[in-house]
Amino acid sequence: MSVTVASEAMSILANHVYVIPPDSDLTMDNYSFKVISPRSGRTKQVDLFFISMANEMSARAVGIVLSGYDGDGTEGCKHIKANGGKTFTQDMSAEVDYMPLSAQAAGCVDFVLPLNEIPDKLKSFAAALKT
C-alpha cells in the first residue's frame, strides 16, 4: 500500500494509507480531504479525523491507533465502531502506549496486534470489503 501525506481536496483512493500533515488538522468532506492549518491546538487531532471519517465512510472506515499520548483516537474509534467500521491498535510493543491502551480500555478496538502484523490484517479486511 502507498503511504501519502494528505493534502487539501486530495481524492481518497482505495489501498492507500494517508498521514495527517504536520501542524495541521484533517477532516473529510465529500470523499476528499480538508486540511486545517495551522492546528487549532484545542482538538485531539486523531479524534477529529476519525470522527469525520466515520461520518463520511460509515462501515468502510478503518482507524489505526499506534503510539502516542493523551488518549487521542479513543473517541474517534468509538465513532468508527458505532458506524460499523473497524479499528486497530498496536499492542504493548508501542513505544508510547497511552493512545492504544486508552482505546482498548474503552472497548472500541477490533484488533490489537504487533505493528508488523497490522498491514496483513488490514489487507485481509480490505479484501473482504470488495466481496
Language model regions located:
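Conserved acid/base catalytic micro-environments in cytosolic active-site loops
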Residues: 1-131
